[in-house]
């Protein structure tokens, strides 16, 4: 089964975690990483069975699919690290892909997938 790691614990990241908690999201969440560790940990503490908080590097290592929910400015670095590890990326901030076409080339070269929800 595909496991997901979430980068970002704002409105979208929290919605995904809540969906997982009530069973609406059936893929296992291996962890979460965020630029705002303190607030992310505070939110995780409100969940009954929270995933582990971890560094972005740890998250990528233990997840099959990385879900970016942190804003477009993290996409270039996150995509690079994700694709270097041979993992796939779901970019919630799809506009960043237009601003950084090299990300598409990198995914192609590494045979990784980019999912862009609409």
PLM regions: where:
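NAD(P)-binding Rossmann-fold cofactor-contacting core
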Residues: 23-44
């Amino acid at each position: 089964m595909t496991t997901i790691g979430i980068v970002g614990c704002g409105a979208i990241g929290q919605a995904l975690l809540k969906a997982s908690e009530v069973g609406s999201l059936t893929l296992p969440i291996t962890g979460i990483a965020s630029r705002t560790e303190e607030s992310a940990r505070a939110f995780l503490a409100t969940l009954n069975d929270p995933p582990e908080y971890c560094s972005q590097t740890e998250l990528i290592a233990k997840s099959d699919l990385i879900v970016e929910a942190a804003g477009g400015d993290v996409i270039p670095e996150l995509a690079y690290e994700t694709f270097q590890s041979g993992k796939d990326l779901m970019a919630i901030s799809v506009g960043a892909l237009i601003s950084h076409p090299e990300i598409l080339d990198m995914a192609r070269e590494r045979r990784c997938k980019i999912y862009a929800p609409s």
